[in-house]
């Protein structure tokens, strides 16, 4: 399938600089650039399929991009197309971790029970607000005493502590745990860091 590209897209596809940022409006063809760059790296730069990873923010978008790549270039094999969390999950499995992800319904249930002690009406929006606060705090890697939640500090701390205690007891992970653990491994284990530097030669993020 022939794809019509303008000069800007061709330049982005064939550019040889180590790090490249493509800034363009929605619908302008950034995804088209990415799948064409993957093909260019393989066909022209002789990269191996396993040298390339393509990251996007949802599983649906990753699957769509993978299918577009295969259909456009008539490929049966493709590089890794996935989400950040999907990549982190694979890395941790490769390093010997056993991972069971907590179900979203259970997350909501834990928070609902706690909030019900403080509020007569606990709706899904309030539960999501608490879970978003927990996620923001965890990924900030900061001290809980310095974190400013959008709910009361007392309620937030209780929600956070009971949520983490439940996960620890049941040996469960959430998606933030994946990214935090991978970051820790890469920062504190030079063998692992250098191993993935050698493994992932081309990283494309949509």
List each model region and its residues.
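Conserved pre-motif I regulatory segment
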Residues: 1-23, 159, 176-182
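Short secondary-structure boundary/capping elements
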Residues: 4, 30-33, 184-188
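Walker A/P-loop
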Residues: 17-37
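A basic/glycine-biased coupling hinge at the interface between accessory DNA-binding modules
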Residues: 41-200
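Hydrophobic residues in beta-strands of the RecA-like P-loop NTPase core, especially within AAA+ ATPase
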Residues: 204-205
């Amino acid at each position: 399938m022939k794809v019509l590209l303008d000069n800007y897209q061709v330049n982005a596809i064939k550019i040889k600089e180590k790090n490249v940022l493509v800034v363009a409006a929605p619908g302008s063809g950034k995804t088209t650039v990415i799948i064409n760059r993957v093909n260019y790296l393989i066909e022209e730069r002789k990269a191996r399929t396993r040298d390339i990873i393509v990251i996007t923010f949802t599983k649906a978008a990753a699957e769509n991009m993978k299918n577009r790549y295969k259909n456009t270039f008539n490929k049966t094999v493709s590089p890794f197309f996935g989400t950040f969390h999907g990549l982190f999950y694979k890395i941790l499995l490769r390093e010997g971790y056993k991972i069971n992800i907590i179900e979203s319904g259970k997350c909501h249930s834990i928070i609902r029970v706690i909030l019900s002690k403080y509020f007569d009406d606990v709706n899904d929006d309030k539960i999501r607000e608490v879970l978003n606060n927990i996620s923001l705090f965890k990924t900030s890697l900061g001290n809980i005493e310095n974190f400013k939640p959008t709910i009361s500090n007392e309620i937030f701390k209780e929600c956070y502590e009971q949520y983490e205690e439940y996960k620890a007891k049941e040996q469960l992970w959430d998606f933030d745990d994946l990214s935090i653990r991978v970051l820790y491994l890469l920062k504190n284990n030079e063998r692992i860091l250098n191993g993935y530097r050698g493994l992932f030669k081309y990283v494309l993020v949509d």
